[in-house]
Design a protein with these regions (language model features):
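C-terminal structural segments of small proteins and small subunits
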Residues: 110-133
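Short, thiol/selenol-centered motifs that function as redox-active sites or metal-ligating centers
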Residues: 78, 82-94
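Residue-level detector of well-ordered alpha-helical segments, enriched
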Residues: 73-77, 91, 108
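Polybasic, low-complexity binding patches
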Residues: 106-110, 139
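Alpha-helical scaffold segments that form or flank carboxylate-/histidine-based iron centers
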Residues: 74-83, 112-119
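Iron-sulfur (Fe-S) cluster-binding segments and ferredoxin-like electron-carrier domains
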Residues: 95-106
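Residues in soluble alpha-helical coiled-coils and helical-bundle/repeat scaffolds
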Residues: 65, 69, 86-87, 104
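Acidic, glycine/proline-rich low-complexity segments that act as flexible tails and inter-domain linkers
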Residues: 2-76, 127-140
């Protein structure tokens, strides 16, 4: 079992909607590692089935977020807003990670959160809380 530090974090999972206290690693939280590992593992399982429609859809998704008239950072921010309004926690985590990789600032991120709440209404607030938690973990 990997070494853990004493820093607690709430774990929000689509498969475990209740809250649990967990300990995190210093470099990257278990919350982030769990999400990335699960996503990678399941992508491999799905792509190994060699379904042409799924492969084409995922290719289209990758192409859509490439630089074009809009740069990829702007597209990821738009994807994050859409994911928050649609209340897809896994999608939110994915776009938060990409936004972090692309140099999004915390100030920019909270403007995105504000727009998502304006568009989606109060039902987006719980997703904003989880997004803020995940963002804070990315910044560590």
């Amino acid at each position: 079992m990997p070494e853990r530090c004493n820093s607690p974090v709430l774990n929000f999972s689509i498969f475990r909607p209740y809250l649990t206290k967990r300990k995190t690693k210093n470099c990257m939280s278990e919350l982030i590692n769990d999400f990335n590992n699960y996503r990678s593992k399941m992508n491999e399982v799905i792509l190994a089935k060699d379904n042409l429609v799924l492969k084409r859809f995922w290719s289209l998704d990758n192409q859509a977020y490439a630089d074009g008239a809009l740069n990829s950072k702007t597209k990821e921010l738009l994807g994050l807003i859409s994911s928050m309004v649609l209340r897809c926690d896994d999608c939110i985590k994915y776009h938060l990670g990409k936004c972090h990789e692309l140099g999004t600032t915390t100030e920019e991120m909270y403007e995105v959160f504000a727009i998502a709440n304006l568009v989606g209404g109060s039902i987006v607030i719980p997703h904003t809380r989880r997004a803020a938690e995940y963002w804070e973990e990315l910044l560590k």
